[in-house]
């Protein structure tokens, strides 16, 4: 009887340990969220203004995902350009569009410089639509169907709860772009941190494109976080990369986005001790609080090594 009790105790401990391992990444994400919300309480940061998704890629064949409000639909700003990059590479691979010097230049400027004008050109090419004056209802319906090509592509891959069919602008949309967006912005681009982190993970692991196109995308997303840029909104040094200050040996690939009301980043990080993870952090109504995103990243950097 005693041996049976001992065996039962060992099994219980083993099961409990397994459960703890399964939830530890989620606990890290919860801790990152709570720590950041508490730190920025004086700035009135609330739960509803923060979304986080973390994907542990130490075993790329078995990625583990945890999130905090990861399925909330949020205006993504320039993070949407990551989706247009992937769509363009897929279209090129499938020979739906042609590689031209202008498209090559635009894809580079869209990701490296986060150029809105380059993005507008890329959207024209991959959806076969153009901006301009308002169209009659029937023509507008046909135009909108074409513009939804990127949505249909990602839906075919199982992406849900997102909308990617709008150009990015420095100021505002006019004509058919404004009509498409809707009078109350109901058709604006929307992403979740879950979908965004998944996409970067699929780029990194080579699941979304062939090796040559994967290498091309990774090259465009590679960031220098050394702080040499004087731009506080530099994609390498002004977002997740801020968390690397005082740390050595890290590598960073990312796509950031920001407006007057939003500040986001999705980053793939490789640590000196072999850690690999994707971290997507979206914030709303705190675009001037540049430390929120690196605050989340620091907690993850400090805790990811302890996740089993």
Model segments located where?
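N-terminal leader/targeting segments and the immediately adjacent pre-domain N-terminus
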Residues: 3-69, 92-97, 140, 144, ...
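Structured C-terminal helix/loop/strand segments within mature extracytoplasmic catalytic/sensor domains
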Residues: 21-36, 44-49, 188, 192, ...
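Active-site-adjacent helix/loop patches that line small-molecule binding or acyl-intermediate pockets
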Residues: 24-35, 47, 102-181, 189-194
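Structural recognition of the beta-strand scaffold that forms the well-ordered cores
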Residues: 51-54, 77, 109, 121, ...
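Solvent-exposed loop/turn segments at secondary-structure junctions
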Residues: 58-60, 73-75, 116-118, 128-129, ...
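Active-site SXXK
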Residues: 75-97, 110, 279
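Short glycine/serine- and small hydrophobic-enriched flexible loop segments
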Residues: 86-94, 124, 198-205, 302
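Short, well-structured active-site flanking segments
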Residues: 90-108, 119, 210-214
């Amino acid at each position: 009887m005693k041996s049976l009790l001992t065996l039962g105790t060992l099994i219980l401990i083993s099961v409990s340990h397994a459960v703890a391992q399964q939830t530890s990444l989620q606990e890290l994400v919860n801790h990152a969220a709570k720590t950041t919300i508490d730190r920025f309480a004086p700035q009135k940061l609330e739960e509803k203004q923060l979304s986080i998704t973390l994907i542990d890629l130490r075993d790329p064949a078995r990625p583990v995902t945890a999130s905090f409000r990861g399925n909330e639909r949020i205006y993504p700003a320039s993070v949407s350009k990551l989706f247009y990059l992937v769509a363009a590479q897929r279209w090129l691979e499938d020979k739906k569009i042609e590689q031209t010097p202008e498209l090559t230049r635009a894809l580079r400027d869209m990701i490296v410089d986060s150029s809105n004008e380059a993005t507008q050109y890329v959207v024209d090419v991959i959806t076969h639509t153009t901006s301009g004056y308002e169209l009659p209802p029937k023509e507008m319906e046909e135009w909108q169907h074409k513009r939804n090509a990127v949505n249909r592509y990602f839906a075919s891959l199982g992406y849900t709860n997102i909308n990617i069919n709008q150009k990015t602008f420095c100021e505002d949309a006019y004509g058919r772009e404004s009509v498409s967006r809707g009078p109350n912005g109901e058709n604006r681009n929307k992403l979740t941190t879950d979908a965004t982190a998944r996409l970067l993970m699929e780029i990194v692991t080579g699941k979304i494109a062939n090796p040559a196109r994967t290498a091309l995308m990774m090259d465009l997303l590679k960031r220098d976080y050394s702080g040499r840029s004087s731009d506080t909104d530099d994609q390498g040094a002004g977002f997740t990369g801020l968390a690397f200050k005082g740390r050595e040996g890290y590598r960073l690939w990312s796509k950031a986005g920001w407006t007057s009301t939003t500040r986001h980043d999705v980053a793939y990080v490789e640590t000196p001790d072999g850690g690999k993870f994707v971290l997507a952090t979206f914030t709303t109504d705190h675009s001037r609080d540049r430390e929120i995103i690196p605050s989340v990243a620091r907690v993850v950097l400090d805790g990811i090594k302890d996740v089993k």
